[in-house]
Amino acid sequence: MTQKDQSPRVGFVSLGCPKALVDSEQIITQLRAEGYAISGTYDGADLVVVNTCGFIDEAVQESLDAIGEALTENGKVIVTGCLGAKKDAAGHDIVSSVHPKVLAVTGPHALGEVMQAVHTHLPKPHDPFTDLVPAAGIKLTPKHYAYLKISEGCNHRCSFCIIPSMRGDLVSRPVAEVMLEAENLFKAGVKELLVISQDTSAYGVDVKYRTGFWNGRPLKTRMTELVAALGELAAQYGAWVRLHYVYPYPHVDEIIPLMNGGHVLPYLDVPLQHAHPDVLKRMKRPANAEKTLDRIRAWREVCPDLTIRSTFIAGFPGETEAEFETLLDFIAEAELDRVGCFAYSPVEGATANDLPGALPDEVREERRARFMEVAEEVSARRLQRKVGQTLRVLIDEVNQDGGIGRSSADAPEIDGLVYIAPPAKPSQRYRAGDFVQVKITGADGHDLWGEI
């Protein structure tokens, strides 16, 4: 039996958002660096790590179910992630209360604690194959795109959210460390870098925007300077940079010219949540929808190709029909390209639970459906304008029906797709990770169709 065959094997289940996915990638990278093998099955693993989500009730249940399945199928389970930091009404750890047989429980962003638990229950091999770990680390995404997490935690105290209680206040990564990871990812063949955090706009606030150094030159720990540097680096590799979770602080205006100049994709993911000032105040969010509309108009004047994505909550406690109508009017006037809407769901530990005026489930869901009806009309109208245009598309998948890819307006998993007809000539063949020029021939409310 070879040393590789004898390596202790760890199974891994990763749930939740892209930030949690990055945590999973870091844990798996460290496991491989220490010589552990990763098992794709429960019965092939010596123990299983489950990285959980705990933001909303559905995510909590999904995580608890996944832990239960891992215990049933394997029996040795270490739990990490946001659910690991949640307590029940009595102050007890939720995971251990429901699944007392788990070996260990940690919160999110806890690489050291997870590895300590793994070492305790599955000692590491003496001669790890550190040369098997690429400089870019091990990624759980397709080879052609990757998430780059620039900070951890959040300084906001939105009434509907418990992320700060699970992930803590904002902690920005050193700017040189971020740039080095980005460079390693591009060198590894990544064609699209998705910048994520809980609050991308606040990058560097915690360190007072101190100046770091990258390639011998000063570089401020601040979103604008980081985005410009990432854009310059991406250009050397012909790659994309996409920004997510950008709170609409005033200095966000500074990155729009960078988008228009081609340094980063003209794509802005801005979580607005609502449009009525009273609802926004109850949410403890910035409360000036008129100013937001003015800024959106100004952004589009500077960058006409800008795609704006946002998320909203319908049926927040105390939301009146008039307040909801204000939200619908805002969506129609703002003409946001991509939106998601959630019917409000109470989150244990959130201060919004104490607000008066909780709405019945059916009202919340009915408002969500009405919201999406308006939003999809806007999306269909804006997508129809792209028919006849030629767009640069990144191929995600190739099958017998042709290709499936995404334009600059589409982030993976949350936005639309571009369906591409099979190539008419051998010279037009493409594969996953290729950029191709696609003439758009059709559109619906979410996706595009085209041909090379």
From Swiss-Prot:
Residue sites binding [4Fe-4S] cluster 2 per the record: 154, 158, 161
GO BP term (any one): tRNA modification
Record note on cofactor: Binds 2 [4Fe-4S] clusters. One cluster is coordinated with 3 cysteines and an exchangeable S-adenosyl-L-methionine.
Stored Pfam families: Radical_SAM, TRAM_2, UPF0004
Keyword ATP-binding on entry: no
Subcellular location: Cytoplasm
Domain called Radical SAM core: residue spans: 140-381
Membrane-crossing residue ranges in chain numbering: none
Cofactor(s), names only, from the UniProt record: [4Fe-4S] cluster
Known catalytic reactions: L-aspartate(89)-[ribosomal protein uS12]-hydrogen + (sulfur carrier)-SH + AH2 + 2 S-adenosyl-L-methionine = 3-methylsulfanyl-L-aspartate(89)-[ribosomal protein uS12]-hydrogen + (sulfur carrier)-H + 5'-deoxyadenosine + L-methionine + A + S-adenosyl-L-homocysteine + 2 H(+)
Keywords attached to this entry: 4Fe-4S, Cytoplasm, Iron, Iron-sulfur, Metal-binding, S-adenosyl-L-methionine, Transferase
One Gene Ontology MF term: protein methylthiotransferase activity
SMART domains given in the database record: Elp3
Role summary: Catalyzes the methylthiolation of an aspartic acid residue of ribosomal protein uS12.
Name of the protein in its database record: Ribosomal protein uS12 methylthiotransferase RimO
Organism in which the protein naturally occurs: Cupriavidus pinatubonensis (strain JMP 134 / LMG 1197)
